[in-house]
A protein has these predicted regions:
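Active-site environment of divalent metal-dependent phosphoester hydrolases
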Residues: 11-13, 40-49, 69-71, 128-133, ...
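An N-terminally biased module of ancient metal coordination in phosphate/nucleic-acid-related enzymes
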Residues: 1-72
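Active-site neighborhood of phospho(di)ester-bond hydrolases with catalytic His/Asp-centered motifs
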Residues: 4-6, 37-43, 63-66, 122-125, ...
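Extended substrate/RNA-proximal surfaces in nucleic-acid metabolism proteins
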Residues: 47-148
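Active-site-adjacent C-terminal substructures of enzyme catalytic domains
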Residues: 133-171
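Broad hydrophobic/π-residue packing in well-ordered secondary structure
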Residues: 1, 78-81, 174
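A structural signal for short coil/turn segments at secondary-structure junctions
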Residues: 33, 117-118, 162-163
Length: 175
C-alpha cells in the first residue's frame, strides 16, 4: 500500500489561519509518516518557486496542486507535474478570481480556466466541511477521482456505500 498525502498547505492565504512554512517541518512529516508521495495544495493559489524548492529538498514524488473554493465548497485539483508554467498561470487566474475567504468560483469558471479537467486529479471535500453540494458534484462527477473525508469512521461508511465516492483521508497539514 502506498502512503500519500495530497492535502498539504505551505502558504497561509486569506482562507487560512496564519502560519509560517518550514521545510524542516515538511521533511519531518514526510519521514515520520513514511509518505511516498505528496501534493502541495494551498488555498486558491500555487507558488511555483516554492514548489520547485520543495521538489529539490523532498526525496519523494511531489505533485503540484491547489485547493479551490468552488461553489461554496473545497476541491483539490492536482496536476501531473508537466507544464508547470501553464499550471501556475491557471492557478494565478484562480487567485485573482477568489480575493477573499468568502468568494468562490463556479464549475463553469473552473472549466474555463483549466479547460480539460480529465488532465487532473479532482478530489472534493466529501464528508468534510465545507462539503461539496450535490448539484456541484453532479457537474464534476465524471472527472472526480475520490472524495475527501475527515475520519476513519466516515471512510469506513463510504467504503460500504456503493453510491459513495471512493473515500480518501489526508492530513490537511500546515507546514
Amino acid at each position: 500500500m502506498k502512503k500519500i498525502d495530497f492535502h498539504i498547505h505551505t502558504v497561509a492565504t486569506v482562507s487560512d489561519h496564519s502560519f509560517v512554512f518550514s521545510m524542516d517541518t515538511l521533511k519531518n512529516y514526510v519521514a515520520d509518516m513514511g509518505l511516498e508521495c505528496i501534493a502541495i495544495t494551498n488555498h486558491n493559489m500555487f507558488d511555483l518557486h516554492q514548489y520547485n524548492e520543495i521538489v529539490k529538498e523532498i526525496p519523494i514524488t511531489v505533485f503540484p496542486g491547489i485547493e479551490i473554493d468552488v461553489e461554496g465548497s473545497h476541491l483539490l485539483l492536482i496536476g501531473d507535474g508537466n507544464e508547470l508554467e501553464d499550471f501556475s498561470a491557471k492557478c494565478k487566474k484562480i487567485f485573482m478570481a477568489i480575493p477573499t475567504a468568502n468568494d468562490s468560483i463556479t464549475v463553469e469558471d473552473l472549466e474555463g480556466i483549466f479547460l480539460d479537467l480529465t488532465k487532473y486529479i479532482l478530489i472534493p471535500h466529501y464528508q468534510k466541511n465545507p462539503e461539496i453540494k450535490q448539484a456541484t458534484l453532479n457537474k464534476l462527477r465524471a472527472n472526480v477521482t475520490a472524495g475527501e473525508v475527515t475520519s476513519a469512521k466516515k471512510f469506513k461508511y463510504c467504503i460500504g456505500d456503493d453510491d459513495a465516492l471512493v473515500p480518501v483521508c489526508f492530513g490537511d497539514m500546515r507546514m
